[in-house]
Amino acid sequence: MNKISEISIQSQKTENLVKFNANDDLPKSLFEQKEPHFQAIFDSILSERASKRLSTHKVKNRAEVSGTGKKPWKQKSTGKARAGSKRSPIFVGGGRAFGPTTQRNYNLKVNKKVKKLAFISALSQLAQNQQILVNDFSMNKISTKLLVDQLKIFKIDQLRHILIASSDPNLFLSARNLPNVELVKTNSLTVESLIKADLLIISKNEITNLEKRI
């Protein structure tokens, strides 16, 4: 796996953040790691990005390229090297040998313990910086305006990246038109989304689900 110095993980964060002291509501097993493990975070983010990569690029091999199947010239007595098909990669217009295919797998293996260490490190950083708000942001109906009003109550509507861990469908539909709000189910939280977040909003029930995930 690459060293952490070989890549920079850029994220624009908001200055002068509103602080929330939620340490009393946070379990120590998830949010009280004293020293963040940056190499584990780096490796996990690389793996998360690689797993999203799709092998959509492709070229035609000799079986797929158009052309005759006739033997170009007879086997012997021409002085030329023997050839069996014009679609061979050695001819102009022939198929590509060893080209990119849609079957390529870009996934990078990261050990489970390293993933867990990275996830807890990211959560602990948010807790230490007082960037976690324990609150049930459930919505009775789909309304972006009501959600914005709720964010204004906590004076967090101007933050660049608000991460909400919730499974509420009304909340998801209300937040999808807000560029600075990202709503993710607890079992889909990634290390990269936690690192980029200015604020994590999570309910006590979702914290329990988070403990089960770890």
Swiss-Prot record:
Gene Ontology, cellular component aspect: ribonucleoprotein complex; ribosome
Keywords carried by this UniProt record: Ribonucleoprotein, Ribosomal protein, RNA-binding, rRNA-binding
Location of the region described as Disordered in the Swiss-Prot/TrEMBL record: 56-86
Keyword rRNA-binding assigned: yes
GO molecular function: rRNA binding; structural constituent of ribosome
GO biological process, one term: translation
Transmembrane segments: none
Pfam families named among the record's database cross-references: Ribosomal_L4 (PF00573)
InterPro entries associated with the record: Ribosomal_uL4 (IPR002136), Ribosomal_uL4-like (IPR013005), Ribosomal_uL4_dom_sf (IPR023574)
Biased amino acid composition, Basic residues: 71-85
Quaternary data: Part of the 50S ribosomal subunit.
NCBIfam families to which the protein is assigned, alphabetical: rplD_bact
Role description: One of the primary rRNA binding proteins, this protein initially binds near the 5'-end of the 23S rRNA. It is important during the early stages of 50S assembly. It makes multiple contacts with different domains of the 23S rRNA in the assembled 50S subunit and ribosome.
Annotated family: Belongs to the universal ribosomal protein uL4 family.
The protein's name in its UniProt record: Large ribosomal subunit protein uL4
